[in-house]
Amino acid sequence: MDFQSCLYAIAEELGSEDLAALKFLCLDYIPHKKQETIEDAQKLFLRLREKGMLEEGNLSFLKELLFHISRWDLLVNFLDCNREEMVRELRDPDNAQISPYRVMLFKLSEEVSELELRSFKFLLNNEIPKCKLEDDLSLLEIFVEMEKRTMLAENNLETLKSICDQVNKSLLGKIEDYERSSTERRMSLEGREELPPSVLDEMSLKMAELCDSPREQDSESRTSDKVYQMKNKPRGYCLIINNHDFSKAREDITQLRKMKDRKGTDCDKEALSKTFKELHFEIVSYDDCTANEIHEILEGYQSADHKNKDCFICCILSHGDKGVVYGTDGKEASIYDLTSYFTGSKCPSLSGKPKIFFIQACQGSNFQKGVPDEAGFEQQNHTLEVDSSSHKNYIPDEADFLLGMATVKNCVSYRDPVNGTWYIQSLCQSLRERCPQGDDILSILTGVNYDVSNKDDRRNKGKQMPQPTFTLRKKLFFPP
């Protein structure tokens, strides 16, 4: 297919919502005034060609646009590219042609519900004329109106943050993530600018000598030196140990007579299975395991061949206490012992590869108390349950481990009998949203901390703060 036919075919596949998104992402190249006459994708492509952003043999800008609006089908069908390749490409900020600021605003618009959109309009009533805040006005159009009035800019996010703080705190978290990332990038660039040109030239020469081509250096060296390899499919095993029925524990152990079944845990199991399947892991699940059975399962995967795997994930959903999870028989399994099955000496085929454990269980019986927040937080009216009634090391003292705990030492974690646990549901949602954007796992877990910490147990005035512990040596990404 020739260049013009390719653009025509892509334009024919793009609907009105796609066009609105593309126009917003192109605002830094085509000002709003000049976009008013653009009524279809063909006209947009024509304007981009005039700007030199679309050229035969160079469709990188179009690929980036389609990637951000999630039209991965068009990347595959017309541009011989896929989502995973774009994630790798855009992981290097120097390759991005669309500003992170505009991408952040677009991603925010995708997260806002109809009710939240109405709240945005209400809170802007005094700043933007009512005639501009029409009923069918989208959030992207609201952002444009805010930019016109200098209420919103790359270096002026305070009004937007204030609104998001009132409407949906998770949106505020995304803005703060963007600000942190921008600060890190600016500091990196400033540090580079301080080097004399002669030093930079010498560095560039030495880098070029390390490989046959700059592209190889970008993809291969960066992968081997700074990023864990994630090329195999399946990436590895994802074990899910899902304990629901604790009737045996109640019968056999007097002290555990009040231990409840874990209603809602199947929601977590389903969410984890769906999420990690999308991330190319082989899902293996086990239901209602005793402590001994948990050990036996992990021993089995300790001796498995992980040679053609990049990673190992184990998710344990159960009751727990400080440093332990409970089997359905009420017996304890030490978290440290469970993670230690996968040290380099005990499981050589996983040596140098990331070993990840997500533990949804209480680590004590205390309720974390929250500081009153004027904005408040509405929690659904389901009855919340907890997953049980020294910080010993939970992971071996060697590299390449990550442990995501639902809560900190001595405290409970919360489970909604209808919707699952705060931690696992937030984790899965964040992975599904942010892995396609190229975010690394530690950044994602920081966002999970923010999300979960903003939830409330209104009955006990309790809060929850997840706790990641890790000995990772490199960045860890899960390309979709």
From Swiss-Prot:
The active site is at H319, C362. Changing D225A: Loss of autocatalytic cleavage. Coiled coil: none annotated. Signal peptide: none annotated. Belongs to the peptidase C14A family. Expressed in a wide variety of tissues. Highest expression in spleen, thymus, lung, liver and kidney. Lower expression in heart, brain, testis and skeletal muscle. This is Caspase-8. The keyword Cell cycle does not apply. Its EC number is 3.4.22.61. Changing D387A: Loss of autocatalytic cleavage. Generation of the subunits requires association with the death-inducing signaling complex (DISC), whereas additional processing is likely due to the autocatalytic activity of the activated protease. GZMB and CASP10 can be involved in these processing events. Its main location: cytoplasm. It comes from Mus musculus. The record marks D218, S219, E374, A375, D387, S388 as: Cleavage. Keywords: Acetylation, Apoptosis, Cytoplasm, Hydrolase, Nucleus, Phosphoprotein, Protease, Repeat, Thiol protease, Zymogen. GO terms for biological process: angiogenesis; apoptotic process; apoptotic signaling pathway; cardiac muscle tissue development; execution phase of apoptosis; extrinsic apoptotic signaling pathway; extrinsic apoptotic signaling pathway via death domain receptors; heart development.
